[in-house]
Structures are given as structure tokens and as C-alpha cells.
């Protein structure tokens, strides 16, 4: 594994280089390279079929690439692991639809997700340590749900459920967060609050955010990567990629 990292001069939380994968002759990912630094937030945009979901599937071990390198922190080859193992290594993934347990409180949802529990349901009957309590309170404050910690998750707004699931995800202490269309279905106010949350998260985690909402991406104020036909079409600030003629033709102008 050390041989794989000899030519990587910089430190990366996530390193994809020359990655390709085909399904029944269709090249879903085509020589894709993506380099995410520790503490970096990156927005990923592109039309339907651009390869955004497949890219995340490859990173998380759901799909094996045909060629290329996929490394975590420069030296861990993620292609050797399945989804559960990749999650334990330190790569967390949040899908578009929230998957909180609505019959439990906000506090209990985060309690269940805390890393190191022997089993999901046993943790409900296992006394929390002072350290556990402190960690849960820190997460509740981070996701701005400390005042709703006793409320049932079912009674939260869509945006609050998204924040709760993000809290559950970070309770497992991932170093890289992959987040799929977080702003979908949110109110304008929730969207802006989510952007602020992500900025706070980026101080301790690397974030890869797949999104269609350009106002949300603008609020993130981060580097943007545009995917098209499974490859990187353009990278830069949102203003830079919006002015790119190729991007206008294949995506933003549609």
C-alpha cells in the first residue's frame, strides 16, 4: 500500500485518480479524478446521469471501479472494503431522504448512533456515561436541535430531520462526509441554516456535497466540481463554473 502513495505529494482526506467503471458497456464513470483535502468542503453538480451517485457508490464500497485509485487519507485503499467497513474506516454517507427513527426522540436517535455501542437497541437500556451525555449535547448544539431534544423525531420539520440525521452521522466520528442533495424539500430558511451548519462541520470534517440548488451552493461558498458523462468537466468557484461555456452547454443552460 505504501507503493500507492509514493507519488501523492499532498495530504488528502479523499483521493480518486483515474477512476472508471462500466455497466453493461455503458461507462458511468470515465477516468474521474477528485482530490479532497482535510477540512475541505466541495460541492458536486451535474445533470442527471453525470455519475454523481455512482461516484459516491464507489467511494463508499457499494460499487467496485474497473480502474483507478480510491484512497482515504492517502494510504487506505477503499476499493478493498465493503460499505460497512468503509463507514467504520471513517467515511460517512447521508442519502437524500432522512432515515431517522420517528418513534424515538431527537436525543434517543443520536444516542443510538453513538459509536461503540454493542447493538442499536441495547443502547436504549444501557446507562450513558457522562462523556456520552456531553457528546450528545455537543452534537445537539451543533445541529441546533438542543431545544427539541425531547421531541419525537416524527414531529420535526423536514429540515430538522435532515439536521438530526447529520447529527447521527457525525456521532460516528467520520472524517469524510458524503451528503446527497441536503437542500431538497427544505424551506429557504432551512436551506440557509443548513449551509451554515455545513460551514461549521467543515472545520472538523471533509464534506462532499452533491446538490442541484444553486442558491444553496452559493451560500456554501466552496469549490465546485462539475461532472458530465462520468468525468470532471470543470472546477472552481461557482461563478467560475457558471461562466464556463462547456458547463453552460451541457448543464446550466438546460
Predicted features by range, described:
Residues 45-47:
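The feature captures the beta-strand-to-loop junction immediately N-terminal to the Walker
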Residues 60:
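Helix-to-loop junction immediately C-terminal to a conserved catalytic motif
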Residues 69-88:
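ABC ATPase NBD Q-loop/coupling interface
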Residues 79-80, 139-155, 160:
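Conserved ABC nucleotide-binding domain
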Residues 123-148, 196:
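Conserved ABC ATPase "signature" region
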Residues 177-181:
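Catalytic Walker B motif of ABC-type/P-loop ATPase nucleotide-binding domains
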